[in-house]
């Protein structure tokens, strides 16, 4: 756990409900999770920017999460899955440049398997915006070093190790801040987790204030 960045939530979770929703959608078309080897079942197709039609299936959870905050990012909200511990989500940020307010926080609910989220010191001069989404907006940062050294190389892993500031084990629901570079490491597969990315949150709403709201409502 990293205070103010990635913390456990004291909330009740109906795992059977999440499994039921996952089994409903995994029979249908999946979505690539950006450039990563993860497979996702989210509210928006990452490649086209069009709705996937899963909102009805996900409504039991979305309806509760909208009580916390009415805005969520369609592209990132849904299930993220990996069938191997060799697959991870590379170090990145998640940002929203197309909303009125800048803040965004993710709830991550483990459903199957296990994973760890590593966090890294984030220096402006070491990151860049590599691409735009289907709507024409930059949506994440990447390390220059990843492009220069290559993802997964010993040199880049050493770079990450030198900048690691902490981690959190995703074995129960967590709330995370995503403007700091972080990556997801699968430690037990198959891995499936639910993510709701609440966005368009006013900048004066702190991590702790939002966490308290999540725990009060959920």
Predicted regions and their residues:
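Non-heme Fe(II)/2-oxoglutarate
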Residues: 1-80, 88
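Intrinsic-disorder/low-complexity, polar/charged segments enriched in Ser/Thr/Lys/Arg/Asp/Glu/Gln
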Residues: 4-8, 104-106, 163, 193
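Extended hydrophobic/Leu-rich segments
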Residues: 5, 18-21, 58, 62, ...
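Short beta-strand-to-loop capping motifs
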Residues: 10-13, 111, 196-200
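Secondary-structure boundary elements
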Residues: 67-71, 112-116, 201
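A structural signal for short, well-ordered beta-strand segments and their strand-loop junctions
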Residues: 73-78, 106-110, 118-121, 175-177, ...
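Catalytic core of non-heme Fe(II) oxygenases with the double-stranded beta-helix
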Residues: 80-169
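Catalytic core of Fe(II)/2-oxoglutarate
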Residues: 142-218
